[in-house]
């Protein structure tokens, strides 16, 4: 049976303590006879009066014990503040409010970003969750009683009032058996340095800095559900990580069970949401561990009616990261998932590749297309038109025009298929009497294939433009989902291109209906199938896009409108007129 090891103590500490007590006891026993042998003789008896005075004095004083140490131990040094007070540290990017109760953060405001309601600066500390489960930069220990003492103690601070970065603030606390020191260093970036050390009953214990309970930017149940814990270890056995060296492992809520300890190495780790992150950057990735935290919280069902009694249960995530076997010295990034900022934030790495935080921006499997699209969109915004909505319009126009040759190729392919449609039907009628298992049925496919080759027709040619456009659509979806720049970006009547806009979604549905009506249908298409493509497909796509980001609907609706103009022009060309005449002939034959 393995021996239980207290995680707060180093291995063997209990045995060493027992050995110290045993040696002390032996020294006291051996020292007592020596005191009797070498002590001076007793003084001769004095007069009665003097004896009475001496006896009186002796009665009032404590009688020394032979086993009492010659020098008493020094009194316990305590460091405790008399009252709670706040210390504010700020630079051009943030304003952090510390409380000396727990030496933890009560408010963390990002000055350059608005909250979701767009009525004030962004507050990252979720007050409801923090009051229940702990504030940022409090300390995690495996002993809940010690953890509660660490977060409720009144620390002595090295500074007071409001400080401007660069600055350093130290919090200290000591009582009979607990000694704590927390030091925070601030500069002009989103990164701060965190140093912590905790001793309990004379032994150093593990106490990890933590961000315990979600972000203040989370307001709706959906935003809470978007919370994750991201980490990068660069030494993972995950199959995907082996293929992609900079692959980031992401723990969604359903994969997190509170209190689990994950062993490192960790180059960085911490809770994130769609646009912001609070990740710890250990100074020694090899020695780092992470404790995952998950708790439940009751929030208003409708964030716009916080006074309502209707609530819903959500899950909040957090993480504690650091060294389990001693003091901690690490950095922490708390800020936006903005690619340029993350790439400028250095990280100690194990393999010296991608030594920054760029992995926090999750482009997903379509990153090969999504990231260049995003960088192109940013360039358009900064160099051509200083509005994100119009930048999307310009980019969509260029993409759609670039796909014009494919659309022309699609029309040519459809025309060729219409020309040979009677011959294909004749071949099919020829082999109609044979069953599918009859070997002669294969001859039908061979004849049709030979006909395609002779006429230069490609039955899949009509689908090519759609197949080419599909990756761009998915990449746009991924890009707009993580593009911090589009958060609260305005365009015409739209206040936030990253949020749904139902007017634009309806416009997208109408544009798809128009597109289906003016696009020539392939030869031989069943009328019921044609009707479904004309009506059901736009409605189905509208249902999907109705609650997606307005920026994505803008891209798709504009792409449809440009395609409508292209198709209207192409319908007037010789190729278009020929396709229309053939379609009219097919219609007249069906009427007969």
Q: Where do the language-model regions lie?
A:
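General helical secondary-structure elements
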Residues: 11-12, 63, 178, 246
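Compositionally biased regions
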Residues: 57-61, 66, 153, 159, ...
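Selective for proline/serine-rich intrinsically disordered segments
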Residues: 31, 60-62, 67-73, 134, ...
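Aromatic/His-enriched, Gly/Pro-containing loop or helix-boundary segments
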Residues: 10-15, 52-54, 60, 79, ...
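Soluble non-transmembrane domains of integral membrane proteins
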Residues: 86-355
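Juxtamembrane extramembrane loops of integral membrane proteins
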Residues: 2-4, 33-128, 171, 586-592
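Helix-loop-helix
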Residues: 1-52, 98, 196-197, 217-222, ...
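Intrinsically disordered/low-complexity terminal segments and short unstructured peptides
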Residues: 23, 50-56, 75-77, 156, ...
């Amino acid at each position: 049976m393995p021996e239980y090891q207290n995680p707060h103590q180093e291995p063997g500490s209990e045995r060493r303590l027992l050995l110290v007590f045993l040696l002390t006891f032996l020294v006291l026993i051996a020292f007592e006879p020596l005191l009797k042998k070498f002590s001076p003789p007793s003084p001769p008896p004095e007069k009665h009066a003097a004896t009475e005075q001496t006896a009186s004095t002796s009665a009032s004083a404590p009688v020394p014990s032979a086993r009492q140490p010659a020098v008493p131990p020094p009194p316990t040094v305590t460091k405790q503040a008399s009252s709670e007070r706040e210390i504010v540290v700020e630079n051009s990017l943030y304003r952090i409010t510390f409380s000396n109760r727990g030496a933890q953060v009560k408010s963390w405001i990002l000055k350059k970003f608005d909250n979701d309601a767009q009525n004030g600066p962004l507050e990252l500390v979720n007050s409801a969750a923090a009051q229940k489960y702990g504030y940022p930069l409090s300390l995690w220990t495996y002993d809940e009683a010690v953890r509660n003492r660490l977060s409720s103690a009144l620390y002595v601070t090295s500074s007071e009032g409001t400080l401007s970065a660069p600055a350093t603030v130290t919090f200290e606390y000591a009582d009979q058996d607990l000694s704590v020191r927390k030091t925070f260093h601030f500069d002009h970036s989103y990164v701060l340095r965190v140093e912590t050390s905790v001793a309990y009953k004379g032994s150093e214990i593990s106490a990890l800095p933590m961000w315990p309970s979600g972000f203040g930017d989370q307001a709706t149940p959906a935003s809470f559900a978007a919370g994750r814990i991201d980490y990068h270890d660069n030494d993972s056995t995950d199959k995907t990580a082996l293929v992609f060296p900079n692959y980031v492992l992401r723990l969604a809520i359903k994969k997190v069970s509170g209190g689990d300890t994950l062993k490192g190495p960790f180059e960085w780790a911490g809770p994130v949401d769609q646009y912001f992150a609070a990740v710890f950057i250990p100074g020694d990735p090899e020695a780092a561990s992470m404790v995952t935290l998950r708790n439940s919280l009751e929030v208003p069902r409708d964030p716009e009616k916080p006074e309502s009694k209707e609530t819903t249960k959500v899950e909040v995530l957090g993480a504690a990261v650091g060294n389990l076997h001693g003091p901690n010295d690490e950095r922490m990034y708390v800020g936006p998932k903005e690619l340029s900022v993350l790439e400028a934030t250095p990280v100690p790495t194990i393999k010296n590749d991608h030594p920054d935080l760029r992995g926090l921006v999750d482009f997903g499997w379509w990153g090969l297309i999504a990231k260049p699209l995003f960088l192109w969109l940013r360039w358009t915004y900064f160099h051509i038109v200083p509005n994100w909505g119009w930048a999307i319009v310009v980019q969509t126009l260029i993409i759609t025009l670039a796909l014009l040759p494919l659309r022309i190729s699609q029309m040519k392919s459809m025309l060729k298929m219409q020309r040979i449609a009677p011959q294909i039907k004749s071949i099919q009628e020829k082999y109609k009497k044979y069953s599918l298992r009859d070997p002669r049925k294969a001859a039908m496919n061979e004849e049709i294939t030979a006909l395609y080759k002779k006429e230069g027709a490609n039955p899949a040619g009509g689908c090519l433009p759609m197949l080419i456009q599909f990756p761009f659509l998915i990449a746009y979806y991924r890009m707009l989902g993580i593009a911090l720049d589009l958060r609260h970006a305005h365009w015409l009547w739209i206040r936030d291109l990253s949020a749904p806009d139902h007017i634009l979604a309806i416009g997208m549905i109408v544009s798809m209906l128009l597109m289906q009506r003016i696009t020539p249908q392939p030869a031989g298409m069943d009328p019921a199938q044609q009707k479904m493509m004309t009506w059901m497909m736009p409605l189905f796509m509208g249902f999907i896009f109705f609650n997606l980001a307005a920026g994505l609907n803008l891209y798709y609706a504009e792409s449809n409108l440009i395609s409508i103009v292209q198709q209207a022009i192409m319908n007037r060309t010789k190729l278009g007129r020929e396709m229309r005449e053939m379609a009219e002939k097919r219609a007249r034959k069906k009427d007969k």
